[in-house]
């Protein structure tokens, strides 16, 4: 079946509000000149979300606006955190959950990630659940085992029929310049579908879009576009410049 393709840019801790505005203007112009069939999304820092939302409305560009993180509670004494009502108010439509940097730098557990996935879905936004193995785990031959655990625990509180995306991001390939072989990525994506089928249904497994993330650049994006179970990309550094992000996205213009 034909699944919707997504190419999502994760800016991480980059770009001021003014830089974000200039970026969206550039990307909007590129998309107007050459519309793409894939859904292009940007997960910016919290400070730029409102400005980007306004730019999307002004330019008429079809861009999916996302956040890089959220707290599962709707309000409370959580210093430094952002809630779902706050994100919805500034036009956010999807949220990255379980990114490896949140897991490993900030110590987020599978249980906490599961609560975020559930809260994002209940708020009417789309959670993008990120999963992936470390180099040590891969070398030990335990990648499937770890990813299955992350998926089952991360989706534990989700109902069948709830909308979500999965992003496979091998930890050893994020920001390192190391790129996974297309055959390895295809294998993991097929395995992710098997786990989703086990957790929900075969129909859900066939419908769900699974993205790849890990040192994706213009010169290697094509290899993933040719994989039957890769439905898009989660792009880090290559998403920070509008032209390069656009060139990456063209590999999923089907």
Curated annotation (Swiss-Prot):
CDD domains cross-referenced by the UniProt entry? TIM
Q: Which residues are substrate-binding?
A: 10-12, 175, 215, 236-237
**To which protein family does this belong?**
Belongs to the triosephosphate isomerase family.
Which SUPFAM superfamilies has this protein been placed in?
A: Triosephosphate isomerase (TIM)
Per the record, the major location class is: cytoplasm
Alphabetized, the UniProt keywords read:
Cytoplasm, Gluconeogenesis, Glycolysis, Isomerase
* One biological process term in Gene Ontology: glyceraldehyde-3-phosphate biosynthetic process
The record ties this protein, via Pfam families, to: TIM
Annotated metabolic or biological route of this protein = Carbohydrate biosynthesis; gluconeogenesis; Carbohydrate degradation; glycolysis; D-glyceraldehyde 3-phosphate from glycerone phosphate: step 1/1
The gene coding this protein? tpiA
Under the cellular component aspect of Gene Ontology, which terms does the record hold? cytosol
Q: What does the function comment of this entry state?
A: Involved in the gluconeogenesis. Catalyzes stereospecifically the conversion of dihydroxyacetone phosphate (DHAP) to D-glyceraldehyde-3-phosphate (G3P).
Catalytic activity field:
D-glyceraldehyde 3-phosphate = dihydroxyacetone phosphate
Q: Which organism is it from?
A: Chlamydia pneumoniae
Q: Keyword tRNA processing on this protein?
A: no
Matching InterPro entries, A to Z? Aldolase_TIM, TIM_sf, TrioseP_Isoase_bac/euk, Triosephosphate_isomerase, Triosephosphate_isomerase_AS
- What EC number(s) does its UniProt record assign? 5.3.1.1
Self-association and partners: Homodimer.
The protein's name in its UniProt record: Triosephosphate isomerase
Q: Where is the active site?
A: 99, 169
Compartment(s): Cytoplasm
What GO MF terms are annotated?
triose-phosphate isomerase activity
